[in-house]
Amino acid sequence: ISDSLVIIGYKEVVNFSFISKNYSNTKNQLLIENPISKDKSIMRESLLPGLMNNVSYNTKRQQKSIRLFEKGKTYHRNNKEIYEINIISGILSGYKSPTDLVLNTYKYGIDDLKADILSIIPNVKFNVNRDSIYFDSDNSLKIYLNETLIGECGMISSSLMNDFDIKDCVFAFEIFEDKISLDPNAAYKEISQFPAVYKDITVVANKQYKILNLIDKIHKNSYKYMKNIRIKDIF
């Protein structure tokens, strides 16, 4: 899953396993006896607070498109028993393609989040989720694979966004890694032996000619070798 997230544009981060007790939704918090600071006083029950801090840090440094993920353990207590859960969490915020002349006004939405989840774990299903501490109650979904609950996703709640001083909408997912079984019938494509080649193409066309039609013609004549087209400028 980590490799798949990197391929579709996510960057991996690593955060402390300690968070503020304000971001815990249980009474069975695992308190740290001598915390290094108040905002690192309990063992984390989710990776999302750390990722939210990453988003806040990057947005304050003029990063307009953010797609991050983290893979790690969360820590829980059930009565006297302490146990760990392996989690993979991803988060996205900002513009989908800030350098693209056409797409630079499009911001990430929940549909982009769902598409990313489906690209790394096909055949998952989504159901409404009303009981999450981290997600907005009207924009939260549970993730199922073969009728098994494997995680949740949605738009981060406004209260949590305010805690981290984030203005743009933030979307995230958390997946229980141990509940995912690999498909034995999965098919794999051979990786190309040739390096990627980037080309700048200048086209002179009538003003009435639609750009999307031009892109479509280029795609159809690329013999499936071309992976992506971006419009850099119009003059």
Indicate where each model-derived feature is located:
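Intrinsically disordered or highly flexible coil/loop and linker segments, enriched in small
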Residues: 10-19, 42, 57-68, 97-99, ...
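Conserved alpha/beta core surface patches that mediate binding of polyanionic ligands
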Residues: 13, 45-91, 169-184, 223-235
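A glycine-rich phosphate-binding loop feature that marks nucleotide/adenosyl-phosphate handling sites
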Residues: 17-28, 67-77, 90, 128-143, ...
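Hydrophobic alpha-helical scaffolding
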Residues: 4, 37-45, 61, 80-81, ...
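Short, hydrophobic beta-strand segments
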Residues: 1, 31-35, 84-104, 140-144, ...
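Short, glycine-/Ser/Thr-/acidic-enriched flexible segments
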Residues: 18-20, 37-38, 58, 73-77, ...
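Extended, well-folded interaction surfaces typified by the phenylalanyl-tRNA synthetase beta subunit core
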Residues: 1-69
